[in-house]
Amino acid sequence: MNNTEYYDRLGLSKDASQDEIKRAYRKLSKKYHPDINKEPGAEEKYKEILEAYETLSDAQKRAAYDQYGPDGANGFGGQGSFGGFDGGAGFGGFEDIFSSFFGGGATRNPNAPRQGDDLQYRVNLSFEEAVFGAEKEIHYNREVTCKTCSGSGAKPGTSPVTCGRCHGHGVINVDTQTPLGMMRRQVTCDVCHGTGQEIKDPCQTCHGTGREKQSHTVSVKIPAGVETGQQIRLAGQGEAGFNGGPYGDLFVVINVNPSDKFTRDGSTIYYTLNISFVQAALGDTVEVPTVHGNVEMVIPAGTQTGKTFRLKGKGAPRLRGGSQGDQLVTVKIVTPTKLNDAQKEALLAFAKASGDEKVAPQKKGFFNKVKDVLEDL
């Protein structure tokens, strides 16, 4: 049977080497990866490329595909599918089938591309930056593909070889004696640590890991209206992938520093305004600070402490709605702690006019008088 579709997807002939297959995949994944290419159909194209690579990069799957097509690569190889207890082109040996009933299952191709790890970075914002938005430069260290060996882990001029212990599978079978008899299970290969490949002559830059630490700087736009705990995802700014896989993502976690004037809940900003009892009784026009600048607000005569006024549109923007929140101003009437004689007389006259003739000012003792004198010095 002439099965060439997977080779065609990678632009290769059927006699392509593993290095050619890997290079073709890396080239095409950079072109069609959905984090890079936003055109319609790019994601579907990338999935087709990945499917072809996962099959052709595995020697057993490739042999099954060449003989039986896609069904053979997935374990259904037609007349030769069962093969025998020593393994065939489709299913593995009897022990592999048996182990699948006990959690073994099919093993993943150790050389298949895998996305890199995600990273997290916490950024601190001032109260105002969170309200209006900001642009921040973030500096951090991450694992990137080693430039010396292009991620292979091998010294330039050499290549990794198929692991002699697991024969490229990344796992080995281990026999264990149980009350039910001898059981066989699969464990990660202790030589290649699951990669399926051995590096005889490692790269001196990355010491065989295929990756190296590098300082990285990225600019992130903080949208207006963010709050503590919210995250911004920067695709592809995490750590390098494995076997040609894409980079992971960077998650920027927001932390908003408190304000010495305001508090906030969502798009609503809160402010406490201190006024005198004279202003509360007679009314006044006062200046109130907001994040948008000072505004004038009318205090009606007879305002009680705890009264809340709403300043429309003076809050924070709603993160997804786009409209502006409000600022709520709560009045707090401040009682004076020091009065001169004229002020006391005026208040006593006010009390008498109000019918509160029983009001008797507290007389200060000697020590309180001394304290007042010292405070005035």
Swiss-Prot record:
Subcellular location: Cytoplasm
Keywords: Chaperone, Cytoplasm, DNA replication, Metal-binding, Repeat, Stress response, Zinc, Zinc-finger
UniProt remark on cofactor binding: Binds 2 Zn(2+) ions per monomer.
PROSITE patterns, sorted: DNAJ_1, DNAJ_2, ZF_CR
Record-listed Zn(2+) 1 binding positions: C146, C149, C203, C206
InterPro entries the UniProt entry points to: DnaJ, DnaJ_C, DnaJ_domain, DnaJ_domain_CS, HSP40/DnaJ_pept-bd, HSP_DnaJ_Cys-rich_dom, HSP_DnaJ_Cys-rich_dom_sf, J_dom_sf
Start and end residues of each J domain: 5-69
First and last residues of every CXXCXGXG motif repeat: 146-153, 163-170, 189-196, 203-210
Zinc-finger ranges (CR-type): 133-215
Cofactor dependence: Zn(2+)
PANTHER family attached to this UniProt entry: CHAPERONE PROTEIN DNAJ, DNAJ HOMOLOG 1, MITOCHONDRIAL-RELATED
Assembly and oligomerization: Homodimer.
Name this polypeptide is given: Chaperone protein DnaJ
This protein's encoding gene: dnaJ
